Amino acid sequence: MKAAEIREKFLKFFESKGHTIVRSSSLVPGNDPTLMFTNSGMVQFKDVFLGTDQRPYTRATTAQRSVRAGGKHNDLENVGYTARHHTFFEMLGNFSFGDYFKHDAIRFAWELLTTVYQLPKDKLWVTVYQEDDEAYDIWAKEVGVPAERIIRIGDNKGARYASDNFWTMGDTGPCGPCTEIFYDHGPDVWGGPPGSPEEDGDRYIEIWNLVFMQFNRDAQGNMTRLPKQSVDTGMGLERLAAVLQHVHSNYEIDLFQNLIKAAARVTETADLNNNSLKVIADHIRACSFLIVDGVIPGNEGRGYVLRRIVRRAIRHGYKLGRKGAFFHKLVADLVAEMGAAYPELKEAEQRVTDVLRQEEERFFETIEHGMSILEAALADVEAKGGKVLDGELAFKLHDTYGFPLDLTADVCRERGMTVDEPAFDDAMARQREQARAAGKFKATQGLEYTGAKTTFHGYEEIAFDDAKVVALYVEGSSVGEVKAGQDAVVVLDHTPFYAESGGQVGDQGVLANAATRFAVADTLKVQADVIGHHGTLEQGTLKVGDVLRAEIDAQRRARTQRNHSATHLMHKALREVLGAHVQQKGSLVDADKTRFDFAHNAPLTDDEIRRVEQIVNDEILANAPGIVRVMPYDEAVKGGAMALFGEKYGDEVRVLDLGFSRELCGGTHVQRTGDIGLFKIVVEGGVAAGIRRVEAITGDNAVRYVQELDARVNEAAAALKAQPSELTQRIAQVQEQVKSLEKELGALKSKLASSQGDELAQQAVEVGGVFVLAATLDGADAKTLRETVDKLKYKLKSAAIVLAAVEGGKVSLIAGVTPEASKKVKAGELVNFVAQQVGGKGGGRPDMAQAGGTEPANLPGALAGVKGWIEARL
């Protein structure tokens, strides 16, 4: 039975039992920044189990795409070397939300395994929690499993309820016992039943886990029965397929065998049992589906995990002798295997292929050099009888060649060696310290402050009259008084100043009273809810306890707000135009512009930029109000508010509805979209592989930009004697004229070269049967020099020639040697002889080579030495 049929039978079976088939959710957990990847079937139902979400069904079944390759759930190191470890896997599951419980869950599982899949009953063993007599009795008395094949597992992990057969969602919350079903591969395979000393063997393999959410555990560890008891089950498709296809390794099932054969094809590998092929076959699944769900290779978070997986696959291809891009070619094979079950993979095939190809090409630029250095270092360690690679070298590979530490460690592990990671960490720490010392930054997080939080009034006010100074800092130290001319950090009890956060810059402004004036140049957080005003005391003396009027630069704030609000609209517009894979990777919002980095694997076309601008400006013209609500985080994300991975959110969050955009945001914004005025994208480019950057301006800045652009268009039109509306046509005409003139010029240069060639041939000097010529050809370009050398070679028959030209303080050199003469004189060596004397270098074939230089004053002497240099070689 093939994997696709196994998946289909599972879903159809539970559908026949009243379950709703629910499509697999994304590998990027929806609106849950705390979880790296979806790693089980229950993730998309977490809120249902917690009682914060309701679905129109109480029974569900899924085939859930899952990844375990980052953080707590990380199987990456073992993938390819064991029978059942994968980065990507499919979890088959059935769920009951306050509907059926243990009896039906166990009965359904037994019926599916023994009747639908027709597994022999005497091959199935089960485990139950030590105290779960109910589950034990169901298996023994209702299902009829013999007592010797039912094993009770107690608290085997060192604490109360810490057991392989007791499941918890966390330290508190829903929990309960579970029962696991194992398949016995028979006495020919080593291993013992679960709970025995030999349980880690391969004879008894867990295939299904049935979790019974029976209790709620409070902070004191007390257990109370849940009013609605639920069921969450999970069975790995790959493990089940191995059992049904009578193989002992998941990599032997049909799905993997087809991918392994494809990997062998693209790497030109004959040995299908090579572990590297298993690694590649596994990794193409994880990488492709992560990209389908919007993850792009990068240097942090999910993107970094994806990059690690891609690079590990590439390195295994490299081990197999593949020195060029190959990994992306497997996407089509994966689509053939899994595209029917997951149409989203088929739809994204080209995008996935492009992202992987770009990442491969980028990594192959560095891997060969880095691998040669690493292999040489490992060979040196082995020659000395060592087992540890120097951490400093590992850091050099990381810092200079882009080798992640885990990649170096992976190579070492395969050689039976380890990396000195403490030394690596020391080198990394030194570099960070040097970067801090070299950089100019305001240290706020290091300030020692133990007072009350700052009350922020900046959402409603631009000034606050009775702000009290509660702390002062000069050069990082707490002081009681600041004098005129000193730079300082001022902490107030109340302030309208916004502290830099979420990509928005801090406010500027003034703190003042009748005798004192403090100019605020920036506002940063001292602690999470404590705001520091950085600046210079321009007048008077400032003491702790003084009362000031705190007033921000209102015009600067207004411009910043326009740009921040436009960023929200642009983010939404980019997702509409480019696709849901667009995710924010960074932003900077100040008074001049908004800079927005996002995941996308190709430059934006002019049409895409225009569409984004049009969508945003349409929202501006709609003049929709900005509506801010403070609500619980779970309620916000359930309502569709976009949360950003990596951002930290409290229990209460601020939700901004602005036009068609809804995001969690603590920044300051316009009252209505119309306040933005005008939106214009001015820069689009790449900042890293798979990361694009857009810069845009708004309001009066955008108006000035358009006016200046209009003025330049008018100037260009006047220079070309055309109307602005005719500019494109006129430019095309000028380009045609230039092309025609360049063609004429080329013909004249060629004619000149021909005539000069005849004259130069007469200057050739015969040395040992070879005509030697070294001369300058005034006004010639590289093409003319080459053509002239070719004609001289033809004319002189046996010759060694160097021609030079000087233009703009730079020397161009072409050397040519006829076939007979090249046996003793090489053009590359000849041109380098001259180039080294004029501050340059070059190279080429034995019969033709070129070079350049930056010291034309030395050219006459260099050419004069050619005859003697050739004489020495004939």
Swiss-Prot record:
Keywords annotated in UniProt: Aminoacyl-tRNA synthetase, ATP-binding, Cytoplasm, Ligase, Metal-binding, Nucleotide-binding, Protein biosynthesis, RNA-binding, tRNA-binding, Zinc
UniProt family annotation: Belongs to the class-II aminoacyl-tRNA synthetase family.
Protein name, as recorded: Alanine--tRNA ligase
Catalytic activity from the UniProt record: tRNA(Ala) + L-alanine + ATP = L-alanyl-tRNA(Ala) + AMP + diphosphate
Function per UniProt: Catalyzes the attachment of alanine to tRNA(Ala) in a two-step reaction: alanine is first activated by ATP to form Ala-AMP and then transferred to the acceptor end of tRNA(Ala). Also edits incorrectly charged Ser-tRNA(Ala) and Gly-tRNA(Ala) via its editing domain.
Record-linked InterPro entries: aa-tRNA-synth_II/BPL/LPL, Ala-tRNA-lgiase_IIc, Ala-tRNA-ligase_IIc_anticod-bd, Ala-tRNA-synth_IIc_core, Ala-tRNA-synth_IIc_N, Ala-tRNA_ligase, Ala_tRNA_ligase_euk/bac, DHHA1_dom
Gene Ontology MF terms in the entry: alanine-tRNA ligase activity; aminoacyl-tRNA deacylase activity; ATP binding; tRNA binding; zinc ion binding
Species annotation: Burkholderia vietnamiensis (strain G4 / LMG 22486) (Burkholderia cepacia (strain R1808))
Binding, Zn(2+): H564, H568, C665, H669
Domains: entry comment: Consists of three domains; the N-terminal catalytic domain, the editing domain and the C-terminal C-Ala domain. The editing domain removes incorrectly charged amino acids, while the C-Ala domain, along with tRNA(Ala), serves as a bridge to cooperatively bring together the editing and aminoacylation centers thus stimulating deacylation of misacylated tRNAs.
Cofactor note: Binds 1 zinc ion per subunit.
Locations listed in the record: Cytoplasm
EC number: 6.1.1.7
Listed GO CC annotations: cytosol
Cofactor(s) for this UniProt protein: Zn(2+)
Highest taxon, organism lineage: Bacteria
Top EC class, one word: ligase
